[in-house]
């Protein structure tokens, strides 16, 4: 009964090495009317295959950079064929990045990364958000991280007001559970911001002054860290991200102008 909701889908059964355990379950499910296949070689063979693929996956990339709240993730979600690393990791790659999410472990992340990218042409120019090597608890594959360093770099800019609004829309800090989770993270900022600033943030959060709370975090924590980490970067293009629909069009135009972009037909969905 547990599997009945999945009867219309193709199921894959596996064990460690693809032996009799998974074979017998496959036969049983097939006799019960399920569409089912056995994973040849088992999970261990699958993992070797995934790791071999990730070791050499270095596609040409367009990497979106910009300060927290500028809209990078929103654009990645809207651009066809992009790779959303934060979605794969289920983490926003920041100190508050796990709020509302269930971060994945390394093996799950790598498996999902493989599923997302293995069918893409190796030379297809792809959008990705600029990240450090670590996203939450997981590490980006080394070859892909190297491709990000060598990719085309675009700097996105937006006003403080716009960034605060977008962060507020993303985190929705209005229910008690979310507020509790955010407040519980604040002590981890004492070393960077000092006790007084952290107490100020806690007070603003308790008073539901979310715009002020986010503004201070951006000015005193996120922006200085971003500027320090990106101080040596040189960008191929700078774009305003005030109007994300226009920014999306500008990005697709930039993509199409590149000498190697693999997919020549990228369209904006209306």
Model-predicted segments: where are they?
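Pre-Walker A (Motif I) flank of P-loop NTPase domains
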Residues: 9, 58-62
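Catalytic cysteine-centered active loop of the rhodanese-like fold, especially the PTP/DSP P-loop
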Residues: 1-39
């Amino acid at each position: 009964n547990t599997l009945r909701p999945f009867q219309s889908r193709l199921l894959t059964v596996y064990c460690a090495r693809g032996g009799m355990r998974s074979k017998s379950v496959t036969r049983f499910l097939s006799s019960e009317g399920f569409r089912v296949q056995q994973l040849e070689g088992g999970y261990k063979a699958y993992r070797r295959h995934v790791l071999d693929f990730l070791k050499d996956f270095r596609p040409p990339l367009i990497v979106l950079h910009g300060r927290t709240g500028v809209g990078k993730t929103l654009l990645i979600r809207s651009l066809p064929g992009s790779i959303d690393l934060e979605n794969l990791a289920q983490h926003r790659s920041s100190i508050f990045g796990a709020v509302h999410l269930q971060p994945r472990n390394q093996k799950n992340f790598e498996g999902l990364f493989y599923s997302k990218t293995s069918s893409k042409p190796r030379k297809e120019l792809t959008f990705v958000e600029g990240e450090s090597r670590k996203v939450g608890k997981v590490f980006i594959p080394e070859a892909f991280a190297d491709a990000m360093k060598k990719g085309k770099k675009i700097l996105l800019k937006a006003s403080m007001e716009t960034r605060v609004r977008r962060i507020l829309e993303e985190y929705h800090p209005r229910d008690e559970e979310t507020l509790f989770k955010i407040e519980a993270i604040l002590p981890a900022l004492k070393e960077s911001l000092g006790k007084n600033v952290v107490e100020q943030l806690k007070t603003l959060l308790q008073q539901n002054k979310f715009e002020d709370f986010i503004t201070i975090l951006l000015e005193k924590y996120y922006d200085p860290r971003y500027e320090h980490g990106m101080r040596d970067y040189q960008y191929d293009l700078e774009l305003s991200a005030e109007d994300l629909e226009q920014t999306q069009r500008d990005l697709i135009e930039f993509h199409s102008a590149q000498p190697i972009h693999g997919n020549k037909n990228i369209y904006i969905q209306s």
